[in-house]
Amino acid sequence: MFLEKEGKLIYSYDGETVCIEAWGKDALRVRATKNRSFTGRDWALEAKDAHAGEVEIFEDPSAKGGAFANMYEGTDTSYGKITNGKLHAVIDSGSVITFYHEDGRVLLKEHFRRLRDEESMPLNIMGREYSNGVGDNFRIVARFVARKGEKIFGMGQYQQHELDLKGCMLELAQRNSQVSVPFYLSSIGYGFLWNNPGVGQVMFANNGTEWVTESGKEIDYLVIAGDTPAEIEENYMTLTGKPPMMPEYGMGFWQCKLRYWNQEQLLSVARKYKELGVPLDVIVVDFFHWTKQGEFKFDPKYWPDVPGMCRELKEMGIQVVVSVWPTVDIYSENFEEMKEKGYLVRTEHGVPLTMLCGGNEVFFDATNPDARTYVWEKIKKNYYDQGAKLFWLDVAEPEYSVYDFKNYRYQLGSVQEVGNIYPKYYLKAFYDGMTAEGDAMPISLIRSAWAGSAKYGALVWSGDIVSSFECFQRQVQAGLNMAVAGIPWWTTDIGGFHGARTDDPDFHRLYIRWFEYGCFCPVMRLHGNRNPQEGYGAEQIGSGSDNEIWSFGDEAYEISKKY
């Protein structure tokens, strides 16, 4: 039933195997499965350091004692215990796991409700549940006891007003403006990482916490103890990867809109900032500057001299950032080769398309390392080597036209099983390519992330949000919870993205407030799709109205200059 193996505490009973092991400072990793073995995948965990757990097994209840004798009052049978620094875990003969701080406080306990348990209830509710198995996959549920007065922060970015997530139900899935980063910090004094990239949900209810993955092979989570929130966050980031320092240009002002549709238009905006003496550090080339999606290159009809454009911007002290989508149009020059080599996301049934936006598109499979290399080689040739060396990784969730997660498959597995990890690997393609070129601080603007994305230079923005005061308010808590979840580089579209008119006085007031807020975000970026629309540019799509700091009246301009 209990076994110590290579510093790990192993429990097995009735076809289930539970493994608890030290993983980093003051942290314990728990894996459990009803398969014959564990997958061996570490997901968000980048590295395991030299910390080893101290394992003790007590087969005789009367043998309890020592410094922690009073900590296990509910443990009246045999049990196993593992210690790593400030964190202890006990698993009893009924398979219930309880986590303790070294001072004796209970931090977290699995939720079982059976006659044999401490509460002695005939509900037969299990703390770990495996059901509806197809092959070696299950619908997985992990339950924990709710704690009165507990506050929960983190989990990524959700478009809601709640900062404290206690009482919330959160979907574990990536969507435009929703970013699932499944780490939370508890006011009780621990951190928790759900180390599973599958689609599902979590409920932080008052009568219990419940994690669900719709399709997975094993339960996998990490508990981290600490005396302060900063200590817990430090340990978490050490295990999942710390972010590179933001380059100096990134801390300045970013000018962006949907969209500068040709080279001369973009340069004229940059020149005007220079003439006005207003500092501008970054200007962004948005989507549909390309020939076709998936060809990853400028359309020479509208961008005839990219090296010359980049040189002029550099002379003005301005960096250029280029939008890249993970989409490949079925009529693009790279589609057939990528399809033949297995570099594209596959559908399980129906029409083999994943997005419809200005064409018929399929996402490239960022979980496939060869696909990542292939895409970077195109990016390097057509952008990086032309002088455009910084990137905006849009549609990074990826944004399926139909969010039918069970219908899509990556090389790494079905989207239901592994889908939330896509933005991390999408980002990794650019991080690996840029570091190979000697970039010591590779940062990419991206619309999604997962646990561990920070290591690869994720600068997340909050997606295509609405231009309203209510939506603006939601971004404040979204940014704070993203930081707690381990994504420190974060920003928004100043003014919001959808629904504003450049000539609307009400929007001018919103813009001013948002601009002031944007100044104090990690990155200050003005972006949006302003009305009325202008119907010129590439054949696939038009362009929004002006979106520069002088576009919203004299008062807004003077205030913007101040900030």
Predicted feature locations:
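Conserved catalytic/cofactor-binding microenvironments
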Residues: 563
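Basic, gly/Ser/Thr/Pro-rich low-complexity segments located predominantly at protein N termini
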Residues: 140, 154, 159-161, 172, ...
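N-terminal accessory segment at the very beginning of proteins
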Residues: 1-250, 256-258, 263-271, 282-285, ...
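Aromatic- and carboxylate-enriched substrate-binding clefts and catalytic-loop regions
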Residues: 46, 118, 129, 279-560
